C-alpha cells in the first residue's frame, strides 16, 4: 500500500543506531512520528559522522604522539580556558541528560547531546584546539588538550549508550583498548557519568556563548559579501551594550579574532552612524493586544533612534497608545541595521556587528598566502602524504605571487 516503512531496509541501509536516534530525537515518544528516511540519513551524517570524525581526529594525533593517558590528570586550574570551558559544558550536559532520562524524556536528552557534539565539541572546541595537537613536544598544554578531548569522547560514549548502544560500544572500546583506564569489558557495564559541579563555570560558558554568537554573525556577513574566511579583514565594530558586555568580549577577543580571521575589534559607544530600523512583529502583537495591534504597530514604525536604543538596552518600552499604557517588548519587534559604505552590518537581538569589508594590498597578499596553504594541504591529502612527511613546494613566479610569498614565507612553510 505504500503507507509503511520496512524497518529492516532502513536498518540495513543506515544501521540500528542512526534509526533509533532519529526516531527518539525527532519527536517525543508519546507523539506521532512523521517518518522521513532522509532524516535518518542526516542523523547518520551530521551526528554520528561528526562524532566519528572527532574521534578520528583525536586518534590520528594521539597515535602520532603516542598518547596513552598514563600521565596524572592535570588539575582544572592548570588547564587552558578553552579546556575548562568544554569540561564545564560537558558537566552541564551530564546533568541535563541525567535529568531528562530520569524524567522519561529521551528526546530532550538526545537533542542535548547532539547540540554539544555539533556546536560545542566539533565546531568550536576541536577547531580552536587543532594547533595544540599539531605542534611538536609534549608540554602541559598538549597533554591537557589530549586529556580533555579524551574525557569528552569517553563520557559521550556512556551518555549515548542508552540510545546508540553499538556506536557507544565501539567508541568506548577503541578508547579504552589503548589507555586501559577502565576495567569494564563493555560500556554497558560502566557507571553513568557523574556530574561534577566544581567543574562548572557558568560565567565562562556565558562568555564563550557570546564569542560563538559574534563569530556566527561575522561569518554570516562574510558569506553575504562573498568573502572567504581565508581572506583576512581589518576590523569589526561592536556597539558597547554595558560594562559587563565589554569585559566579556575582551576576555574572548583573541579567540574571536582568530576564528573569523579579523585583525582587531573596535568598541564603540556612539552608534549614531549606524542606521537602525524597526518594524512590528504582527504574529507577536496580535494575540497580545488584539484590536490595539494596528495603532501599536503604527507607534513602533514611527519610533526614532533614541527609542529604539532604549528598547534594546532595557528590553521593553512603555508607551501610551489610544489612551492606554502598553509595554512593548523586544520580542514584539524586529530590529535591523542597514549597511553603511565600506561596512557590512547585522544584528541579532540587542547585539550589533559591523564588519570592515575594505581590502588593502597587505590583506590581499595574506589572503593569497592562506589560499596557497589550503591548496597545498589538499595536494598533500590527494597524494596520500602523512602529516609528518616533509615536502618541497614550487610556485610559478609572477609579481603578485612573488610579493605574497616574500611577505608570508614563514607562515606558508609552517602551515604546510
Positions of predicted regions on the chain:
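Non-catalytic, structured segments within soluble enzyme domains
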Residues: 21-22
Amino acid at each position: 500500500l505504500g503507507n509503511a516503512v520496512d524497518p529492516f531496509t532502513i536498518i540495513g541501509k543506515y544501521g540500528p543506531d542512526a534509526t533509533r536516534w532519529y526516531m527518539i530525537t525527532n519527536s517525543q515518544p508519546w507523539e506521532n512520528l512523521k517518518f522521513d528516511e532522509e532524516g535518518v540519513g542526516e542523523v547518520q551524517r551530521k551526528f554520528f559522522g561528526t562524532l566519528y570524525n572527532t574521534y578520528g581526529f583525536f586518534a590520528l594525533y594521539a597515535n602520532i604522539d603516542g598518547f596513552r593517558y598514563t600521565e596524572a590528570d592535570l588539575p582544572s586550574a592548570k588547564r587552558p580556558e578553552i579546556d575548562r570551558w568544554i569540561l564545564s559544558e560537558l558537566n552541564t550536559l551530564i546533568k541535563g541528560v541525567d535529568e531528562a532520562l530520569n524524567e522519561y524524556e529521551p528526546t530532550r536528552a538526545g537533542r542535548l547531546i547532539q547540540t554539544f557534539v555539533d556546536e560545542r565539541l566539533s565546531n568550536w572546541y576541536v577547531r580552536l584546539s587543532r594547533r595544540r595537537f599539531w605542534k611538536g613536544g609534549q608540554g602541559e598544554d598538549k597533554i591537557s588538550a589530549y586529556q580533555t578531548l579524551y574525557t569528552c569522547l569517553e563520557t559521550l560514549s556512556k551518555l549515548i549508550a542508552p540510545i546508540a548502544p553499538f556506536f557507544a560500544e565501539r567508541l568506548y572500546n577503541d578508547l579504552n583498548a589503548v589507555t586501559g583506564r577502565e576495567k569494564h569489558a563493555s560500556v554497558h557495564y560502566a557507571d553513568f557519568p557523574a556530574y561534577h559541579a566544581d567543574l562548572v563555570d557558568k560565567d565562562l560558558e556565558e562568555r564563550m556563548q557570546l564569542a560563538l554568537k559574534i563569530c556566527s554573525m561575522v561569518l554570516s556577513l562574510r558569506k553575504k559579501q562573498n568573502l572567504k574566511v581565508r581572506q583576512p579583514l581589518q576590523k569589526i565594530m561592536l556597539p558597547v551594550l554595558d560594562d559587563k558586555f565589554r569585559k566579556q568580549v575582551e576576555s574572548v577577543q583573541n579567540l574571536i579574532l582568530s576564528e573569523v580571521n579579523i585583525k582587531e575589534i573596535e568598541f564603540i559607544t556612539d552608534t549614531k552612524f549606524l542606521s537602525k530600523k524597526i518594524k512590528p512583529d504582527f504574529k507577536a502583537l496580535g494575540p497580545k493586544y488584539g484590536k490595539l495591534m494596528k495603532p501599536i504597530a503604527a507607534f513602533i514604525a514611527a519610533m526614532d533612534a533614541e527609542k529604539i536604543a532604549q528598547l534594546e538596552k532595557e528590553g521593553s518600552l512603555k508607551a501610551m497608545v489610544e489612551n492606554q499604557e502598553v509595554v512593548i517588548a523586544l520580542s514584539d519587534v524586529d530590529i535591523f541595521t542597514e549597511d553603511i559604505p565600506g561596512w557590512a552590518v547585522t544584528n541579532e537581538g540587542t547585539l550589533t556587528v559591523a564588519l570592515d569589508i575594505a581590502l588593502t594590498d597587505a590583506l590581499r597578499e595574506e589572503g593569497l598566502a592562506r589560499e596557497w596553504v589550503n591548496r597545498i594541504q589538499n595536494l598533500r591529502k590527494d597524494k596520500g602524504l602523512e602529516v609528518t612527511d616533509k615536502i618541497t613546494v614550487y610556485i610559478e613566479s609572477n609579481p603578485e605571487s612573488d610579493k605574497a610569498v616574500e611577505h608570508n614565507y614563514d607562515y606558508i612553510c609552517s602551515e604546510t
